[in-house]
Amino acid sequence: MSYKQVIIIGAGLAGSEAAWQVASSGVPVKLVEMRPIKSTPAHHTSEFGELVCSNSFGALSPDRAAGLLQKELRIFNSLIVQTADKFAVPAGGALAVDRSKFSIALTEALSNHPLIEIKRFEQLDLPSKENITILATGPLTADELSYKIQAFTGIDACHFFDAASPIIYGDTIDQEIVFKASRYDKGDPAYFNCPMGKNDYINFRNELIKGEQVNLKDFEKESANFFEACLPIEEIARRGVDTMRYGPLKSIGLWNPKWGDLFDRENRLKKRPHAVVQLRKEDLEGKLLNMVGFQTNLKWSEQKRIFRLIPGLEKAEFVRFGVMHRNTFLESPKLLLPTLQFLKRENLFAAGQITGTEGYAAAAAGGLLAGINASLLAKGKKTVSFPDQSMIGSLMNFISNKNQILSNQQKNKFQPMPASFGLVPELIKRIKDKRLRYKAYQERSTEALNDFKNQLDSCFDKDHLLSKIY
């Protein structure tokens, strides 16, 4: 039986993975890549899946979030991860690759597939509604297509810069120091508050100002409004000794009952902190906490060093560090189903960094799911979502409308997220030991995915499904 061609825009990691999954299921693909006709400021070749930042896919061990994600992708014979395994270079406990050999091999694998048609041109608009399409254009989507995506999704649902605060694990804060409260006791105590004395504050500000920053790329410097909408915390600190105290670190209206009677003026003046750093829940359970107002351009090592000076965060572990860079991404929880289909157009999918995932393996995971579902749709079958217990499923839930249902994310600005154990559902039986807990997450994921894959296999011609590459 012949099927209508699926169009995939973008041959980065997500687009390449999606193309392979669709073609391997017996459905023809048109893979559109604008390079080398038109390049981006960050790319240097015309190869598919060019790694423009690090050459690392993160930790290999499945007791790490990135490692579990890689393991899950191997279960489904991911083109990206299999190619990365083949061209791995020594990197301790991480999966790192020879960039050139990796991208050349990807390009050859896709170019030689009989069901994949490669087209090199700049896509200026979304394909017609009759076409099953996967949008995988990445964080440097060309301007013309960006405008069309913005028109399709709505002006408030497409972002062009990523100014994100760090996120830390909730169980790594010092509960003896940090207290829960909302300003002026309005509503439930929604924030975790880190009080700072005057000396703490001055020392923190001095280190913040001295902290080493990431060098912006030329195309980021050229954007006049890059820092205007969302000032880095270190820039706020530079504007005056007390500027942070009257901005994101203001202490007014926050009180810890341990300090005594709030209405005793003398006690209040004596005990009120000089400044307060607030942490906001990213999920209902409080496993992930966002540092409110701490968007930053500091290097990651400096963020870890300086932010651990905050009382209560001395042993904080970071899920993700703050970033400020050019990054086209969607307000995905308002737009996407967990299947990566757009709510308003079921035959249009999005995958990769444009959906708000971070990391190479996460991009591949989005491509894998979008590719599987585009194949199912082409065959007139029902699309699927990955099990909640898996890292892939949890990550796709976070960037989809399921997030709106499961968390308070609809109240907060959506921020891109890497793979994290903070996203997966809690175990039925709580395990305190972190190493054993992560092992249990891994075992639960593997069991759920094996069952899921068996069910998925029945939807496809097994001679085609998710075929091996080498």
Swiss-Prot record:
> Per its UniProt record, what InterPro entries does this chain match?
FAD/NAD-bd_sf, MnmG-rel, MnmG-rel_CS, MnmG_N, TrmFO
Protein family: Belongs to the MnmG family. TrmFO subfamily.
NCBIfam families in alphabetical order: gid_trmFO, PRK05335.1
Function field: Catalyzes the folate-dependent formation of 5-methyl-uridine at position 54 (M-5-U54) in all tRNAs.
- Annotated Pfam families: GIDA
Q: Which SUPFAM superfamilies match?
A: FAD/NAD(P)-binding domain (SSF51905)
Record-level Gene Ontology MF annotations:
flavin adenine dinucleotide binding; tRNA (uracil(54)-C5)-methyltransferase activity, 5,10-methylenetetrahydrofolate-dependent
Mind listing the UniProt keywords for this protein, alphabetically? Cytoplasm, FAD, Flavoprotein, Methyltransferase, NAD, NADP, Transferase, tRNA processing
Enzyme Commission code: 2.1.1.74
**What's a single GO CC term here?**
cytosol
Q: Where in the cell is it found?
A: Cytoplasm
Q: What is this protein called?
A: Methylenetetrahydrofolate--tRNA-(uracil-5-)-methyltransferase TrmFO
- GO biological process assignments: tRNA methylation; tRNA wobble uridine modification
The positions annotated for binding FAD are G10, A11, G12, L13, A14, G15
Q: What is its main location?
A: cytoplasm
Q: Which Gene3D superfamilies match?
A: FAD/NAD(P)-binding domain
Does the record bear NADP in its keywords? yes
Could you confirm whether the keyword Methyltransferase appears in this record?
A: yes
Q: According to the UniProt record, what class of enzyme is this? A: transferase
Q: Which reaction does it catalyse?
A: uridine(54) in tRNA + (6R)-5,10-methylene-5,6,7,8-tetrahydrofolate + NADH + H(+) = 5-methyluridine(54) in tRNA + (6S)-5,6,7,8-tetrahydrofolate + NAD(+); uridine(54) in tRNA + (6R)-5,10-methylene-5,6,7,8-tetrahydrofolate + NADPH + H(+) = 5-methyluridine(54) in tRNA + (6S)-5,6,7,8-tetrahydrofolate + NADP(+)
Listed cofactors: FAD
